[in-house]
Curated annotation (Swiss-Prot):
Domain Radical SAM core: 1-214
Cofactor(s) the protein needs: [4Fe-4S] cluster
InterPro entries in the cross-refs: Aldolase_TIM (IPR013785), Pep_rSAM_mat_YydG (IPR023904), Radical_SAM_PqqE_MftC-like (IPR050377), rSAM (IPR007197)
Any Pfam family matching the protein: Radical_SAM
Domain of life per record: Bacteria
Organism (species): Bacillus subtilis (strain 168)
Lineage: Bacteria, Bacillati, Bacillota, Bacilli, Bacillales
The protein, known as: Putative peptide biosynthesis protein YydG
Encoding gene (name): yydG
Length: 319
């Protein structure tokens, strides 16, 4: 379980410095893993018989296209599927659009997700996105999608109008902002959509798990923007194998309780001890991932649950 896909956040550097960026990426960001280590990781993932999909994101992965292509060429002989996430800045050059799509098609890229909305617009022209979407029609085997982060005051409807016919047939997803990264200080809370509350028990479940090797060197159990501000890491040593990472994901008691009992288990403990405000848990939220971020964003908070988790273990597993 959880061993068929893996994601790598290559670099925090980006051509943009968006107000909503979960990583607070910018042209001056320098946080990244060493290239040789990334090469070793990708080689390990490519050779792993259980991994089917390898995903690359950033920062902006196309800023160092030579390195990105090198990594994809490492993977190609092993016939793994590749997915990419980009803000599409490179679409301004039709020559690059042609080159990159030709390479992606030959290197088994099955999906390209473009992140573009009103927050990206100051840094990337809509014509760049339009060029990418229009050219993608020549490559039906590459699934193109457009992801748009939105707030109440910036729904990006005029962006869709600017893109015109180029969006026909393209999967478009608008998703509400999560207050993490740059958004914590640059996006007003009243502008963030909040569909759920702590009273909605059906919303208090973790939506899923994907192993992510982050550019800060940590290994995280999912790809939600909020997870990168928590202390839930699967890393125990530098040369940790992928098999060991999967083992840690499956055996971690905190994550097991999340999968089995949901966030309600942790929230009930806080309610019983009048700790909801102390843990800064939002009553209303756009995504349960924001609650996760508040629950586990410090070692002290995680340690608070240890006695309860130990009791849970003794009651459910200890012989």
């Amino acid at each position: 379980m959880y061993n068929k896909t893996v994601s790598i956040n290559l670099d925090s550097r980006c051509n943009a410095s968006c107000d909503h960026c979960c990583f607070s990426s910018s042209p001056t960001s320098t946080t990244r893993m060493e290239k040789e280590y990334i090469r070793e990781l990708v080689t390990e993932f490519a050779k792993n018989k259980t991994i089917q999909v390898i995903s690359f994101t950033g920062g902006e992965v196309f800023l160092d296209y030579k390195f990105l292509k090198e990594l994809m060429e490492i993977i190609k002989p092993y016939e793994k599927q590749i997915t990419l996430i980009s803000n599409g800045f490179w679409g301004l050059s039709k020559k690059k659009v042609q080159e990159y799509f030709h390479d992606m098609n030959s290197l088994n890229v099955i999906a390209l997700t473009i992140s573009y909305d009103e927050y990206h617009a100051p840094f990337v022209k809509s014509s760049s996105i339009k060029n990418i979407l229009e050219h993608s029609r020549k490559y039906p085997d590459i699934d193109i999608s457009l992801n748009m982060a939105v707030t109440k005051d910036k729904m990006s409807n005029h962006i869709l109008e600017e893109l015109g016919d180029s969006i026909l047939g393209v999967k478009i997803t608008k998703f509400p902002m999560i207050s993490v990264g740059a958004a914590k200080t640059r996006i007003k809370q009243e502008n963030i959509h909040k569909f759920y509350s702590l009273e909605d028990e059906d919303s208090l479940h973790c939506p899923g798990y994907d192993i992510v090797y982050h550019h800060d060197g940590e290994i995280y159990p999912c790809c939600s923007p909020a997870i990168f501000e928590t202390k839930i890491t699967l890393r125990e040593e530098y040369n940790q194998s992928f098999e060991r990472t999967v083992e840690k994901l499956n055996s971690n008691l905190l994550l097991f309780i999340l999968r089995k009992e949901g966030f309600k288990w942790f929230l009930n403990i806080l309610k019983e001890n009048n700790k909801i405000e102390e843990f800064d848990i939002p009553y209303e939220f756009s995504s349960i991932c924001g609650v996760c971020g508040s629950l586990f964003n410090s070692a002290e908070k995680i340690n608070y649950f240890y006695p309860y988790m130990e009791k849970y273990y003794n009651e459910n597993f200890k012989v």
